[in-house]
Amino acid sequence: MKKQEDFKGGYAMLQLVLGRSGSGKTQWIYERLSALVDTEEDRPLLCVVPEQFSFETERSLLEALGPHRAARIQVLSFTRMAETVFRSTGGFAGRRLDDSSRMLLMSRALEMTAGQLSLYTRHTADPEYISSMLSMLSELKQCAVTPLALEKTAKALPKGTLAMKAQELSLIYGAYEALLGHTYLDPLDDLTRLAEVLPESGLLKGALLFVDAFKGFTAQEMQVLSALLNMADTVTVTLCTDTLDDTAQGLGRFSPVIRTGLRLEQLAQRQHIPVAKPVVLSENRRSRSEALLRLEEESFLPDGSPLETPADDVTLTACADIYAECTFTARTIRRLLREEDARCRDFAVVTRNLDEYRGILDAALEMEGIPYFLDTREDILTEPLVSITLCALRCAAGWDTELLLRLMKTGLAGFSAHSISQLENYVLMWRIHGIGWTRDWEGNPDGLDAPFTEETAKKLDSLNRLRRRLIRPLEHLRYTLYPRSTAASPEDAADRLTGRDFAAAVYRYLTETRAARMVRLQVARLDRDGEHALADRYARLWDMLIDRLDAFAAAMGGDRLPADRLTELFRLSLQAADLGSIPQSLDAVQIGAADRMRFSAPRTVFILGANEGIFPAYPAQGGLLSDRERQQLIELGLPLAEPSEQQTVEERFFAYMALSAPSERLYVSYRCSNAAGETLTPSLLAETVSRLLPNCRRLTVPTEEENSLGGIESHTDAFGRMAELWHAETAVAASLKAFFSAQPEMRSRIDALERAADDKPIAFRDPQTARQLFGREMRISSSQIEQYHKCRFAYFCQYGLHIKAARPAELDSLAFGTLAHYVMSSLLPQYVKAGLDGLTQAKVRTDTRRTVEQYVEERMGGLDNKPARFRHLLEQLLRTSSSLLWYVVQE
């Protein structure tokens, strides 16, 4: 078989290609692959890259080699390599876990081991605690640490907290693995299994393997590389460093990468595999900008020398706050798109913490009409479909009025806004709660003291039909989840059911409420309105929920648990679900976090948040193990992630990669204050730019003067600037007013702006509207005049819109007065007509009781469904009314 030769003419199994950022390592691989496509027709050619870089690599190879030649090369991530091998070896036999199912199993593992734990005994439904455990589990698996290895390490430690932690972690880890059994496959184990089956599969035997764009490898990935070294004819690995000699003794910007290179060489040497002399690429092929080259060469070096010439390609910006920073970024991108031959995909925005910028940066880009792709994880618990499901489960455990109203307002229960308002007004008026939702309502919909007419009876009948339509599917769900519960106390029931029964009950509820149809209608409406991204999200939410129910039924199996516990676990699984984002445009600004982002040859890069402790970030605090404990375990042979000192070094590497990413232009911004108004200082990253490039462009934002057009990059910007300059007597203000006044569609907005800016009194512009609200003739009482002068808006609401404050149907002072007046007006004329001689106080009491009970029956729906407080207050009213009537009779 023909062997590959390195560039020195000798044969090698491991070839390292070294070079700093921009030195052309990836291009070197593409050129090498291009040559091998023509000369090595019999051997597999593989290019292994990080998962998030695979699409870009495939596209680049397609553009460089053409479709026919590019088809000879397999572009794989480690995950895709595992999938490829498992398809041939049968490694997919089992149900694969996702984050939601993993959360369920960890919660159950904690529950199973609770009696053996002392340190890790928190609540098994606490999402943050479970996430911490899963994070620790992920680290252990990626570091190829088994439960047995943890247990052995715990026994080797002296008695103390760390020994207890290691022992308890091994118990939890072991319980988790036991739950996996032979039924489930944890993707976190894929690379471990891949390393085991690779030698037997023979699929990659004799391959020419190129590994590119990794900054380091986990222990699992090193195990896979170890197996590949024994199978492939050559393994070529690129590393972002120009040397393997770590003169900085572990503290340099390339120290983490150098450690990776040395580990690879040691791995090959232990297996007696030859290692070629590294290929070192020294020329920067990315940029010709002197300023950008200086940053790449000298950043984070103690003896870096400043560039004394102008450095206009680099801009250092001091921003007032995060909002000014994002606005500046969006407007600058818009300006560059307008002024230069640039496309959105030529721009990249880098932050250290994407969550900090979510809702601000994307809003600023949308304001400027700039397409972007921001792959973020969003909380789906507030989505209507998820909300109606969780509300239904909680309502089944007890008829909570607030939850029932929330369920109706999701828009998926089939109730119109008018119906929801009617129900809400009624339940608030009559204080309906608990079991009151399951009984026919009898209270007057118009209030406690309103007459009960035929029209009122129709309203009440309509409300009861709405109530039954809401409650009936929930009662079916309740009877499945709590079959032995009484109507009053479901939480006391000892009912247990399987995860399959639980999932089936939830699906039946969604079917009865026709939630799927409502989702389809919403998707169609959003599509018609042009909201295609939101429509796609709603459609995927339904698929996600059904997948979650299937996964829940499978993960819980036949184990019988209380319904409340199953509800907790199902909520956990939904909380861990990731709907993901789908790019809506091929030409979009790329936004990413510095530790995960893979740059696709951006011409311009914006680095945001170059503040102390933000970027570079301080080492993460917390976690289940302290730095000291982590170091002790590493010294005992457990290959855990490095402690915080090494994290600090890695942060500098992330900053270096961001600084060296652009080919033409770099913007670095830092904030002067946070949301609380506290002062923020520039970080080492910003200080490095300032020190190495003393003549770079420096800006402070906001910078616009009132008479300036600066910063106006869109129609929205221009309207906002006009509002700011409304009272300014400048040429810019006049020009903007003239520009928008000439647009008929802007007339209403300008009028509204003028009224607000000039503080003009609110008045009817259309007399017909005033007549419709107040009539042709207005009759004004003294109380109305008093209300008008007290609050004009309150007067308008009360007498124009005829809005009444919602008032509970209870015997308050107003109802008391109405009822007392009714008693007096009903009985006193009778007594006067019949004569007062012989009238006794006992008869007055009897007549008063009869009159009040008649009033309550006719106008308040009777006493049968009234609470004890109502009856008590009614007795007080009877005594008071009777005494008052007797006093008047005596007078």
Predicted regions mapped to residue ranges:
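Short, Lys/Arg-enriched N-terminal segments with co-localized hydrophobic residues
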Residues: 2-12
